């Protein structure tokens, strides 16, 4: 191969360079050596990357059929977004949910399930008439994402072995509920997920369950958007949070993970780890100090109070069982969507 290997210079170093040589990380003492793979002093160590960062979806996903328990007003697909090959998954295939304050998009990943979310007052800008300002001055921001990674090993990342079977994802427009259904390779376990941004409890709820011989083994992490200047994510007691401040508003977001009795939920600096679970619920709340009724459009609440507001919402939601949260949301959301119906006859 006549192509020169790529290399990078180590930050703060006068003459140290790194390159990747056939799966090994090589350290060189000058650029010429790195480019030509020759020269004095170098050290080589084998690269062992984590599969979590190498892959976005399992290799084999077999399509399923339209679920029978969703309304006739529903969008459904039998392939995860990561398998569609589109360049902009958020714009083209992610399914949106919202309650007027908190919104999310779901992509239906099996290996990596990304729940991107935003909140309607997370605004990058200041008060006043924005019509005279540059287009980039103020705009609504993406808050971030919850990442739920499958750690079970039940499916294959790099071969057609152990395929995901009967996969389908959907958005029930009448009930304001998204979902993903699929089965294990041997069809001995049925997996189901339900997502909704509660119209009554004002939180995002993501419900994961496995019925059959296999259990859920998940890692849940927080990924703040890179454009909002968020502080470090803090993981503690089965939950996570982050906060920050932009030109006008200060903000906070937090989630809590719960699982059935008998499952193991542990927390470390890398995230929340759930093992041997039959069901897992993830609850998210987010808020800012924006208040259009106050001077300067600020509520006057400090960072601690904003965080307390978020935690109060989470505490109230997690005190209820999942079925109650689900039924309350569907009853309220569908009451709006069923107010009228237009039937255009053939």
Predicted features and spans:
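Extracellular glycan-recognition/adhesion modules and their associated mucin-like linkers
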Residues: 1-24, 34-52
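Intrinsic disorder/low-complexity detector
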Residues: 3, 21-22, 31-32, 39, ...
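Beta-strand-rich extracellular passenger or scaffold domains
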Residues: 27-29
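Aromatic-residue-lined binding/catalytic grooves and analogous aromatic/hydrophobic interfacial grooves
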Residues: 50-346
């Amino acid at each position: 191969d006549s192509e020169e290997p790529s290399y990078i210079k180590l930050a703060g170093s006068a003459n140290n360079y790194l390159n990747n040589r056939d799966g090994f990380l090589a350290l060189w003492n000058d650029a010429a050596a790195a480019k030509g793979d020759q020269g004095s002093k170098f050290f080589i160590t084998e690269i062992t990357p984590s599969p979590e960062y190498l892959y976005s979806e399992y290799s084999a996903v077999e399509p399923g059929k339209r679920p029978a328990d969703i309304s006739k007003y529903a969008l459904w697909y039998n392939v995860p977004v990561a398998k569609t090959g589109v360049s902009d998954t958020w714009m083209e295939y992610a399914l949106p949910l919202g309650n007027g304050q908190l919104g999310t998009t779901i992509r239906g990943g099996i290996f990596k399930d990304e729940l991107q979310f935003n909140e309607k007052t997370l605004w990058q800008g200041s008060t006043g008439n924005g019509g005279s300002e540059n287009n980039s001055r103020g705009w609504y921001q993406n808050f971030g994402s919850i990442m739920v990674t499958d750690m079970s090993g039940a499916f294959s990342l790099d071969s057609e072995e152990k395929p995901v079977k009967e996969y389908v994802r959907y958005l029930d427009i009448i009930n304001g509920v998204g979902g993903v259904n699929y089965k294990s390779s041997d069809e001995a376990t049925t997996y189901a997920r339900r997502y909704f941004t509660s119209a009554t409890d004002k939180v995002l709820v993501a419900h994961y369950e496995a019925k059959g011989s296999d259990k859920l083994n998940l890692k849940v992490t927080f990924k703040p958007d890179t454009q909002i200047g968020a502080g470090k994510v803090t993981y503690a007691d089965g939950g996570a949070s982050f906060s920050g401040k932009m030109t006008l508003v200060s903000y906070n977001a937090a989630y809590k993970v719960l699982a059935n009795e008998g499952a193991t939920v542990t927390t470390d600096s890398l995230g929340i780890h759930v093992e041997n679970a039959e069901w897992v619920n993830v609850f998210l709340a987010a808020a800012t100090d924006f208040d259009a009724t106050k001077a300067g459009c600020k509520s006057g609440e400090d960072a601690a109070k904003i965080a307390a507001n978020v935690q109060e919402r989470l505490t109230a939601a997690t005190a209820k069982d999942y079925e109650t949260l689900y039924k309350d949301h569907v009853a309220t959301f569908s009451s709006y969507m069923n107010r009228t119906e237009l039937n255009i006859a053939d």
